[in-house]
């Protein structure tokens, strides 16, 4: 079975075709804000300008390989409303034109499913950290339940905000990671875990404050150590609570080596296995939507056009996981 999937919840517009074995084609057009963070309408404008050429390229690629597309998947949410609508409109038209089923995919679940596909993880506790989301999830009674999540901003958003406040370019995460490597000392910053949830906005403010008095390298390092320790603590507690013997890291912040290392150590100490997908499957990509659409279609789930409206606040636990 071949499924074409379109991702476009935020900055990255990406379309891909996958089958059960592999990614066949993937193409992307990335929106980079001229200054500051993402502007939802500008991002949507970017997506509508690029979606035609992008889809034409992917469909032509399929034709050249003699592939017949059996379904169209799209990121239905969560994400920025204007971006989601652009993608959903294109997906509906394409499904009608090709006369194949349409399937709306939960973006967070897609991060998890492609991670499992590409690493061989079976039933992990998942730390999903990106610019828009920070959650700890695990499958229980047929749904991806959220065990812990941020009470305010996501960890990626916190890193990007801090970066902006000290004059570093967007996205801040990679630059902070680089600077942190040259640090000499740890500066205490507020560590906030409440029950199973974490909070990052106070940390961003405290770090910006500290950057006026201390070396930027030391602040970047301390910011990472503090924020990541919070994430690792909650992931470990979710593993204990949900009795999971595996952990997996997904989302754009998952590219951070230090975060991966901290999770790996925690897993080693618990005698659990740690899974880290390749970088290209960690951030937002079309293949994750195509692949999740494929497993959904194979389990008999599709989305009729009349219920294919976008869902900017779509939660993972709203989806019944029939394919696991
Ligand atoms: P989502 O829609 O799932 O919320 P997103 O639109 O934020 O995703 P991602 O690619 O998943 O996109 O994540 C982008 C975030 O990842 C940014 O906040 C960026 O700073 C962060 N990031 C990227 N590389 C690193 C890194 N090496 N270390 C820390 N953070 C990173
Ligand atoms: Fe994402």
From Swiss-Prot:
Any Pfam family matching the protein: TsaD
GO cellular component, one term: cytoplasm
GO molecular function list: iron ion binding; N(6)-L-threonylcarbamoyladenine synthase activity
EC numbers: 2.3.1.234
Gene Ontology biological-process annotations: tRNA threonylcarbamoyladenosine modification
Subcellular location: Cytoplasm
Main location: cytoplasm
SUPFAM superfamilies to which the protein is assigned, alphabetical: Actin-like ATPase domain
Annotated residues for binding of substrate: 128-132, 160, 173, 177, 256
UniProt-annotated binding residues for Fe cation: 107, 111, 128, 284
UniProt keyword list: Acyltransferase, Cytoplasm, Iron, Metal-binding, Transferase, tRNA processing
Cofactor: how bound: Binds 1 Fe(2+) ion per subunit.
Superkingdom of the organism of origin: Archaea
Catalyzed chemical reaction(s): L-threonylcarbamoyladenylate + adenosine(37) in tRNA = N(6)-L-threonylcarbamoyladenosine(37) in tRNA + AMP + H(+)
Needed co-factor(s): Fe(2+)
NCBIfam families in alphabetical order: arch_KAE1 (TIGR03722), gcp_kae1 (TIGR00329), PRK09605.1 (NF007174)
The family this protein is said to belong to: Belongs to the KAE1 / TsaD family.
Function of the protein: Required for the formation of a threonylcarbamoyl group on adenosine at position 37 (t(6)A37) in tRNAs that read codons beginning with adenine. Is a component of the KEOPS complex that is probably involved in the transfer of the threonylcarbamoyl moiety of threonylcarbamoyl-AMP (TC-AMP) to the N6 group of A37. Kae1 likely plays a direct catalytic role in this reaction, but requires other protein(s) of the complex to fulfill this activity.
Subunit note: Monomer. Component of the KEOPS complex that consists of Kae1, Bud32, Cgi121 and Pcc1; the whole complex dimerizes.
Full protein name: tRNA N6-adenosine threonylcarbamoyltransferase
The gene coding this protein: kae1
């Amino acid at each position: 079975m071949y499924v074409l999937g379109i991702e476009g919840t935020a900055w990255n517009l990406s379309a891909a075709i996958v089958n059960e074995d592999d990614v066949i084609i993937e193409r992307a057009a990335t929106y980079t804000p001229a200054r500051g963070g993402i502007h939802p309408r500008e991002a949507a404008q970017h997506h509508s300008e690029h979606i035609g050429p992008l889809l034409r390229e992917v469909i032509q690629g399929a034709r050249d390989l003699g592939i017949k597309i059996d379904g169209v998947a799209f990121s239905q949410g969560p994400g920025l409303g204007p971006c989601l609508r652009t993608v959903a409109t294109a997906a509906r038209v394409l499904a009608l034109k090709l006369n194949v089923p349409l399937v709306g995919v939960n973006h967070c679940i897609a991060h998890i499913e492609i991670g499992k596909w590409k690493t061989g993880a079976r039933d992990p506790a998942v730390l999903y950290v990106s610019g828009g989301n920070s959650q700890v999830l695990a499958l229980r009674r047929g749904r991806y339940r959220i065990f812990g999540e941020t009470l305010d901003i996501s960890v990626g958003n916190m890193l990007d905000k801090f970066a902006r406040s000290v004059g570093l370019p967007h996205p801040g995460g990679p630059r902070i990671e680089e600077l942190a490597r040259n640090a000499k000392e740890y500066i205490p910053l507020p560590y906030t875990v409440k029950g199973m949830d974490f909070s990052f906005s106070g940390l961003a403010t405290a770090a910006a404050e500290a950057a006026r008095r201390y070396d930027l390298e030391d602040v970047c390092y301390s910011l990472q150590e503090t924020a990541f320790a919070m994430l690792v603590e909650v992931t470990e507690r979710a593993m204990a609570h949900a009795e999971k013997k595996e952990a997996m890291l997904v989302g754009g912040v998952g590219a951070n080596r230090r975060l991966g290392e901290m999770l790996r150590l925690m897993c080693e100490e618990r005698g659990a296995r740690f899974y880290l997908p390749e970088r290209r499957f960690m951030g937002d990509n079309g293949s994750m939507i195509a692949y999740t659409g494929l497993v959904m279609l194979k389990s008999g789930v599709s989305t009729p056009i009349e219920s294919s409206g976008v869902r900017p606040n779509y939660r993972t636990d709203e989806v019944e996981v029939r394919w696991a």
